[in-house]
From Swiss-Prot:
Gene responsible for this protein: PROK2
Phylogenetic placement of the source organism: Eukaryota, Metazoa, Chordata, Craniata, Vertebrata
Protein name as annotated: Prokineticin-2
PANTHER family membership: PROKINETICIN, PROKINETICIN-2
Similarity-based family: Belongs to the AVIT (prokineticin) family.
Disulfide links within the chain: 34-46, 40-58, 45-106, 68-114, 108-124
UniProt source species: Bos taurus (Bovine)
Alphabetically ordered keywords of this record: Biological rhythms, Disulfide bond, Neuropeptide, Secreted, Signal
Basic residues bias: start-end ranges: 83-95
Length: 128
C-alpha cells in the first residue's frame, strides 16, 4: 500500500517536467551556444552575445527593417595588408562564415543589404 502511494507521488512529481522538456534535438536551439555558423540552423549565424561577450549564440539573420551593422563579417585573424587584400576579394556576404564574428548581429538575409538610414544607424533594406 505504501509503495504504491510513493510511486504515485513520484509519478506526479516527475511527469510534469518530463512533459515540458523539449526533445533532445531541440535543446541546442534553447541554449543557442555555438562557435561557428555551421552549428546554427538555416537563417541563423553564430554571433557574439549582447550580455556576455565571451559567448557566441545562434542569432537570426536580419530581415527587412531590422537593425544591422556594416562590419558583421569582421573577424580577428591578423590585421596585415595580406588579410585586407583577401577581404577585398571576397565581398560576398555568405552564411556560413567560417571566421569568428566580432559583432552581435548577423548579416541581412539574401536579397537585402545593410544600408545607412541615418547617422550611425543601419537597417536591412531591399537591394537596389
Amino acid at each position: 500500500m505504501r509503495s504504491s502511494r510513493c510511486a504515485r507521488l513520484l509519478l506526479l512529481l516527475l511527469l510534469p517536467p518530463l512533459l515540458l522538456t523539449p526533445p533532445a534535438g531541440d535543446a541546442a536551439v534553447i541554449t543557442g551556444a555555438c562557435d561557428r555558423d555551421p552549428q546554427c540552423g538555416g537563417g541563423m549565424c553564430c554571433a557574439v552575445s549582447l550580455w556576455v561577450k565571451s559567448i557566441r549564440i545562434c542569432t537570426p539573420m536580419g530581415k527587412v527593417g531590422d537593425s544591422c551593422h556594416p562590419m558583421t563579417r569582421k573577424n580577428h585573424f591578423g590585421n596585415g595588408r595580406q588579410e585586407r587584400r583577401k577581404r577585398k576579394r571576397r565581398r560576398k556576404k555568405k552564411v556560413p562564415f567560417l571566421g569568428r564574428r566580432m559583432h552581435h548581429t548577423c548579416p541581412c538575409l539574401p536579397g537585402l543589404a545593410c544600408s545607412r538610414t541615418s547617422f550611425n544607424r543601419y537597417t536591412c533594406l531591399a537591394q537596389k
